[in-house]
Amino acid sequence: MENGFVNFYDHVKGYGFIRRERGRDVFFRYDDFLFLGHDVDICKGILVRFKLEKTDKGFKAVAIQKV
């Protein structure tokens, strides 16, 4: 698992980018968040933990949890 924070999120389109502690920003989609029984207000600046998944376009964040 990696740590970071939401650097950008578009509520209308449902995607954004997470600023990693090390490395480049990583793409995510709303559906990649694990809500664990409660709603999470996804907004710029929230701290998150996530796993990286390799795609044909690079890496994306998955299994994202608010810290």
From Swiss-Prot:
One of its GO terms (biological process) is defense response to virus. Gene3D superfamilies: Nucleic acid-binding proteins. Keywords: Antiviral defense. InterPro entries: Cold_shock_CspA, CSP_DNA-bd, NA-bd_OB-fold. SUPFAM superfamilies: Nucleic acid-binding proteins. GO terms for molecular function: nucleic acid binding. Residues 1-66 form the CSD domain. It comes from the Bacteria. Probable cold shock-like component of antiviral defense system retron Se72, composed of a non-coding RNA (ncRNA), a reverse transcriptase (RT) and this protein. Expression of retron Se72 confers protection against bacteriophage lambda. At multiplicity of infection (MOI) of 0.02 cultures slow growth when infected with lambda but do not collapse, at MOI 2 cultures enter growth stasis. This is Retron Se72 cold shock-like protein.
